[in-house]
Structure formats: C-alpha cells, structure tokens
Amino acid sequence: MKTYGFVRGTMIAMACVAGFAATASLASPFGGAIQPRDLRCEYRVDPLGIDVVEPRLSWTLQSGQRGQVQTAYRILVAGDPKQLAGETGDLWDSGKVASDQSIQVPYAGAPLTSGMACYWKVQVWDKNGKPSAWSRPACWTMGFVGRDSWKAQWIGFDASRNRDPSGRKLDLSGAQWIWLPGENARNAAPVATRYFRREFTVPEDRDLASAVCAVAADNGFTMFLNGQQVCTGGSFKEAVTADLAKHVRKGANVVAIEAQNVGDGANPAGVLAMLVVRFKTGKPETIVTDGQWRSSDIAAAGWTDAGFNAEGWRNAEALGAEGIGPWGKVTVGPAELFLPPAQFLRKEFNVEKPVQRATVYASALGNYELHLNGRQVGDAYFAPGWTDYDVRVYYNTFDVTNQLKKGFNTLGGILADGWYSGHIGWGRLRDHYGKDTRFSAQLTIEYTDGSSETILTDKTWTAATGPILEGDFLMGETYDARKEMPGWSTPDFDDAAWKPVDVTDKLAIAIESYPSVLVRKFQEIKPLSVTPTKDGACIYDMGTNFAGFVRLKVQGAEPGRKIVLRFAERLNPDGTIYTTNLRGARAVDTYLCRGDGKEVWQPRFTFHGFQYVEVTGYPGTPGLDAITGIELTSDTPVVGRFACSDAMTNTLYHNVCQTQRANFIEVPTDCPQRDERLGWMGDAQIYVRTATFNTDVSAFFTKWMVDVEDAQLENGGFSDVSPRKVANGGGTAAWGDAGVICPWTIYTVYGDTRILARHYDAMQKWIDYCKGTTKGTLLRPAEGYGDWLSIKADTPKDVLATAYFAHSTRLVAQTAAVLGKVDDARTYHQLFEQIRDAFNKAYVSADGRVKGDTQTVYVLALAFDLLPKEKRPMAAQHLVDNIRDRDWHLSTGFVGTKDLMATLNAIGRTDVAYHLFHNETFPSWGFSIQHGATSIWERWDGWTPEKGFQDPGMNSFAHYSFGAVCEWMFRTIGGIDTQLAPTEAGGPAYKHIVIRPQMGG
C-alpha cells in the first residue's frame, strides 16, 4: 500500500495566499497580531488603467495565532501618496466597518475619473478588537471612463501586406481517394501503414514558377518529394497545403506518401492529394492521386527517391473522387502561406518641461510591442490580448515616467498579425477578423506645473518593415538580423526612408481596459541533452513539454546563414521529431545571421508547444548552451503546490501544472502545439475548478467570460469556442454549459457576485436555448461531442446532454438566489425538478441502471443529483461493477473523468478512486507517465507500445482535460475542502475551510 504525506504548510499557504479565507493560522513575523497584506484591486496587484468605476478591493490576513479572525476593517483611499501616509483618505475613508469581509469590498468613495491615480491601504481589527498596523500602501490608476475617451487614430503600413497574386487555392478537382488494393478501404481497412509513390518529369527546357500541393489522409500522412519530407498531416476533413518549389528539379521527380490508418480496429482509410507545378510559360503540370500511383505495405530503403525500383509494388485502388463517403467534402486552405512582415511604426516628440507622470495607453488590431527611447515598454507578450474584434478590443496601460527625458523622445510600436489576422485554428485559415492590422496609442504627459500634453497615433507617424519577416502563432517567426535597424525607436535614428502610415480614424467597437493578466515569461528551461542526426541536424530534449519558444545563441556565423528551428512534443521511433500531430501548423522559427560575432535572438510574435527542438544550419557543433527554453503563460499567480511521498503522483502534479500553463495563454485553450489553440468551452468547464487550486485565475476567467458572452449565438446557444472563430458551431451539450459552470465556479471560489450579475442574462438564454431543443420533452437530442475520447464506452449523447441541461438549470437557480432574484430561483428550481423527472422516466430503470450503462452515465446521474434517493445506491453499485469488469480501470472521456473520482468519494468508494489513481496500465494517468509523459495527454492512448501514435488528427500531448483529477488530489489527498459533508455547502470563497485528508492506496 502506498501512503501519502502532504506538505501541510504548503497546503494551508495555498488557501491564504489566494486570499480565500478570513482566518489565518500560519506562523508569521507578526506574532499574535493580525496583519493585512497582499492588497489587490480588481484581482490584481497595483493595476494600471482600469475602467471599473467601483473597483473591488481585497487583501489577505496573516497571524501567528491560531483561530484569529478579522472583525472589522478600515480602508483609506487618497489621490496623493503623501496624504495617504498622513492617514487621510481624501477619496474615501470607509471608517471602521464591523465585518470579516476581506475580499470583494467595493470602493464607495468620490467619483473616479479618467487618468486618476488612487493610493490605498487597509487596517483590520482582530477577534479581541485589537487593531493591526496599517498595511503597506497599494495603488491603482484609472484608464478611460466613458466610451468616447479614445482619441488616437489606428495606424498601419498596408503596403507591407500586399498579397502575392500567385498564391492560388487548390480545389482537389480530379483527385481520387486511393489505398492499397483489396483492403476494403472505404469501410474497414486494417490498422496499418501503407506507402504510395508517383513519378513525374519536369522538362529540361521549362523554368519553374511555383509548385504547391494539397494532401488529406484518413488518418495521417507524411509526404516526401525527391526523398525530402515536405509536409505532414492528420485529417481527412482539411487538406494540408505546402510550397514545394525548392524540392522540384528538372528531370525525374517522385512524390511519395506514407499513410497511417489508426484506431481500435478496422476502419476507413485513404489518401487524397494534388500537386501542381507551374512554369513561367505554358500550361502547368498537375499530379493527382489516382489508380496510376504505386502502392505497397512495405517501405524498402530508398522508396521515396526517384529511380527507386518499384518492382513488386501494385497500382493503388482508386476509391472515388473527392466528396465521396465516408469522407465527404475536404476543406483546402491557401496553397501558399501568406505571412507578412511585422510593421515598425515611430513618432518623435519634444518634452520641454519637467515631467510629473507619463502614461501610455496602447492597443492594436493584431499584436504589438511598445518601445520608447530605445527600450521595450513592459515585459509582456501578445498585447493587447485576444477578443472578438468585431465586438471589442482592449487597451493596455503603462507607466513610462522614468523612460521619458527632456528634449526629443521617440515612441514606437512593432505590429504583427496576432489573433486578429494571423492563422487561427485548422485549415490554414487566416484573416478571421480583418486583413489589415492596426496600432493605436495615447501618451499622456503630466508636467509638474499642472499642464499636460497628449501624443497620439495619427498620420504624422512613419512606418517601415525590418528584420521580422514573418510572425505568426501557428507558422512561426522568421528573423533576418541583417535587416536590423539599430536605434529605430530613438530620436537619433534617421527615418528619412520610412513611409507615411495608413490611418483608420475610429472603430465601431468597444475599446476597453484589459481586465486580465498578460502573457509573460514563467521560467527559463535548460535542455537536458543534444543528439546529432544523420542528416547534420541536432535534436534537443528540453526535459518537459511546455509552451513558448527558445532563445538562440550563435557565434562565428557568416552573414545570411540560415538556422532553422523545428518543434515537436515527441520523437519518432527512429529518433526524429514527431510533427504529424501538428497538422497544418508549420511551427518553424528561422534565424538569418547578422554575421558579426556573438548573436542572441528570440521570437516576439509566436509560440509553440514542444519538448524537442530540431536545429539545422547551426555553424559547427552546437552545445547545450546554444538554446534556452522560454516558457510563456498568462501571469496567473501561483497559489497552490502539491508534494507527497509518491513519485508518480508528484510527476502527475508536475504534468498537470505544466499543461495548465501551456494552455492558459490569454484564453483557456485546448492545446498549444497544433493548428487549433482555441478556447474550447467543454475543456474549460471541465478544468476550471482544478485550475483554481494551482493559480489565481480570477482575472483570467473574468476576462474570458466576456469572450464567452460575446460569442453567444442569437438563439442563446453558446459557441463551442470562445473567442468566436468565424463559422464555428455552438449549442453543444457540456461545451455550451461552460457559460453557466465557469461563472458559478468563479463565484464559489472567489466570492465574485459581479460575474454572476454580468452574465446572468446570458445564462438564462442558454437555459432557454436548451429547453427549446427538447421540443417539449425536456430531453435534449442525441447530438454533440458526447463523452469525448472515452475508451470503448459510448455514452448516449441524449443522456449526457439532458444531464447537463439539468445541472446548468440548477446552477442558474442557485445564481438567481445569490442575486436575490427569488422568483427566478423558484422557477429554475422547479424546471430542474421537471428535467430530473423526465431524465428518470426516460433513462433510469427500476434497478437503477442508466441508459448506456457506461461509467459516465452513472457519474453524471450521481454527481448532478438526478436520481431518487432509493436508486442512488443501485447506480453507485453499477458504477463500481463497471469499473471492476474493466479490471478496475476507467473508461471515461473528457466529460466523465471530471467528476469520476469525486463521485466515488461521495458514494463511499474512495478505495476504488485510489485504485484508479494508482493504475499504471492502460488506460490510466500512470500509463502515460510510464511512457515518458511530461504533460497531460489528450487521449488515454496517445501512444501505446502496440500501436505507436494514435490518430494524428487529434493527438495532442498537452491537453489539460484529464488533468482535472488534480482537483481530487487537493480535496482528497491534501484534504482541502469547503464542505463538512458531500451535501453541505461551506459558503463561497473559502469562508469555511475543512482540512480532512482521506488516506488510501
């Protein structure tokens, strides 16, 4: 039996640092006195430029005396730090307020206006009525109060973004699905790898203009041209496109495709491809998959090369044209990527008087990096953040008082595509919100004489392109150091060759202060090893799977030397990097050397999900110090840590945290590596409670819930992803329910009633939408994603959808009660009871068996309180029996896994939960760890010894949904809970904390 020794001090510190509890019991330098600390405004420390006119103030408490509590507080807010030091609150003096409230205290002082600086501190009284010392002072500043306050114009350099007219789109006309003959490929081909090749000739007298391809496969493929790998993919719905021009040669050529059919058993398989070679004159050469291709089930040496002896290979079987079943229509993105350079924008201005305070407010349609007098402003990445730019855009606020100087100054911005016009999601699609990026900034200078001046983006700015040739989240960044412009954001720089900017006067959308935490560097990661490859490259193992990029160091390179960095989460059996699961994401960074000694470079406008880095083109033999990993994540403060005596459990916790950081980049995404990286709603609601144990995600989810409501459909259905991706679906059970579950979770953890009030109407619309889909039965239809990626356990979609309909309805009833909407609370509670009755009549038999008889149906029925009291023990036994019949293994997918372990606890079978937790055989958390996982896999069988890699169309190795078990780890192993019993609520925001570890194993 394994035992767990939780680090108790760390456990309690988590609760206190997060500001959840009004009590404190840690030893501290304050002795027996109680002391307020960690002051925050709107969830953040000293936030700049907020636009909340009644901001909420919070603090934590520390005392060396067990059982201490706050009994009263006094808050002072002043417009000047000197006044605050004199204990004068000219903006607000709350007076002594008898209350134990230490979070979400609303400001109730003088009206706040644009640009105002507010300094504040707090004093509290303990259980004996003894006052504390005043806290250290904190501050916040106001941004723009009022929608018409933004005066700056929106500028860009459109000439840098001219589309290449040669970028044609392929339509796969004439191509046919092919496979090895005689394998019944349209229905049930064996799980195996097959090989296909086709030779073609380029006449010696024709000059090449371009060569492009589009390839789709069921399930995955790697394509070669003349022996060189040119692209990989893993989807039959979206074709991967690639530029092949540098690989085509005059004379004999061969295109070769290695295709994999994966799955638990025989299933459809096929390859569909088109290659178009265009010449400077005359007709193009088009090669399509058809019966003339040669095929084999054996890959002999040299099979991808021209001149290979294909004796013994057979003609492929043509299965039918593009559009046939079971594959249907295939989406094809642009044949040639459009990756414009970053734009450099600048403006000189003169400061003639002493400066009191200087503040920059900056925004963009795209991503920007702000510079002033030769230095970057701030340390964040990907500002101003991701929104639905058809609805709103955020601005960020920076204090630049110390960067200004008397005389001439220069304000500059670097502008890249970002989420606005860069590649988002699958299909290599871009320009989701617009084609032309824009930058906007207002610099407000307040002088010591009381006067002020504002520098705005307008037509007087100038623009150019520079060393950043490409900057795209999915495709990577290309940087030519020979094109650097030293001093471009300083007054001494000569910008005579720069061009006038293009100007957009105003935007017809909301411009608001950024309410979340920006993306920043979390840590630097040193590689563990570097291994040379047979083709002259080197592969670095960073030791863990993370999101970010690498900093490159090189010395002694000649000017123009190209160093290429490719990124992957795993290695192939032959030691090469596994990139097939990236699908359409190129994920390549390229550095062209300056050639003047030591050079250091890192990207600005891209990130990747990876553990391995392939480096080619490096001069000489690179050492371990040639690259350093830079891990990025949204700057959600760490509030929880977990450690115990079991190595596997500690590794699992590391993997959970690693995956959370990798996917909490601006929004809660599904994965950081492939051509997706979207704010999938189902994943977010499954994981949000776990996230709160690890980091303070209050501001992060406050912002994202605005994205969720912005993406809500007119019929009340929530989008499957938020922010909205153009032409994406919605209204899906367990995914759309995030619009109810996430704000409720933020309320329960942080005591935030405003998030409930703000999104209450949207929550009601969701319930109305769900009810409308039932057509009077209160049973939702069998549609949606179901229990995504379960293991041979097909949970009926109508059961799952109806269970979630009931659950969300109950949460809306509870929300209404919190908001004081008594009639609404009664109405929704009655609706919940009606849905529960319908659920039982339709899906639950007399012996407590639920339709589908999967682990997930029992988890949902029990966790959501859908069963009558007499049937709960029966259903509980069915759940345990199902687990036993699978040799004590789980079969749940995303949805079922979320509540599986807590449900076992609730029915008194914590022993079974520990059994599942300890498993190291498939499927289990331990299985992936046994096979080298350093993050949470998307699939239980992302890789197995028997089958290798799973379907590359859906095979992320950094996907946090199954990491939701971490909530159970904190509640059960760590024993941190807010309930005295499974059915008894402990109040929001850790008003009452129960420390009760449940041992097992």
Feature roles, as predicted:
Residues 10-21:
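Bacterial N-terminal signal peptides
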Residues 366-367, 456-465, 612, 621-655, ...:
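Active-site acid/base region of carbohydrate-active enzymes
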Residues 239-242, 344, 381, 427-428, ...:
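Active-site-adjacent structural elements in folded domains
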Residues 21-29:
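Boundary at the C-terminal end of the N-terminal hydrophobic targeting segment
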Residues 431, 435-442, 454-487, 492, ...:
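Non-catalytic C-terminal accessory modules of carbohydrate-active enzymes
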Residues 845-954:
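Extracellular polysaccharide-recognition and catalytic grooves
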Residues 29-117, 121-674, 682-683, 699-702, ...:
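Extracellular/oxidizing-compartment recognition motifs
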